[in-house]
Swiss-Prot record:
GO terms for molecular function: rRNA binding; structural constituent of ribosome. Part of the 50S ribosomal subunit. Belongs to the universal ribosomal protein uL22 family. Gene3D superfamilies: Ribosomal protein L22/L17. SUPFAM superfamilies: Ribosomal protein L22 (SSF54843). This is Large ribosomal subunit protein uL22. GO terms for biological process: translation.
Length: 114
């Protein structure tokens, strides 16, 4: 079965926060998923929505799939590189702040007939 995918790497949002959004759309039809993302007040929502639109465009252009029949078959988030930063603290000390990044992957396939 044909599948189209889109990957966003080094997204500056923690994987734990992106997973909350990804879990909402996994297994859904793309139209329904876009509607869910538009009404989800999370920072990761616009990023995931843009990625989903990219996956739909890939399916349409590269594999000639029908956009109305697409379903999100796989959606997962992996941890990217962690940027280490320092925050000044009292008494001349410093604490390390981890700025986490994510690699987001969406795979869409055509819904089976019947």
């Amino acid at each position: 079965m044909e599948q189209a995918k889109a990957v966003a790497k080094q997204v500056r949002i923690a994987p734990r926060k992106v997973r909350l959004v990804i879990d909402l759309i996994r297994g859904k039809q793309v139209g329904e998923a876009i509607a869910i993302l538009k009404h989800t007040p999370k920072a990761a929502s616009p990023v995931v929505e843009k990625l989903l639109n990219s996956a739909i465009a890939n399916a349409e252009h590269n594999y000639e799939m029908e956009p109305n029949n697409l379903v999100i078959s796989e959606a997962y988030v992996n941890e990217g590189v962690t940027l280490k930063r320092f925050r000044p603290r009292a008494q001349g000390r410093a604490s390390r702040i981890n700025k986490r990044t994510s690699h987001i992957t969406l795979v869409v396939t055509e819904k089976k007939e019947g």
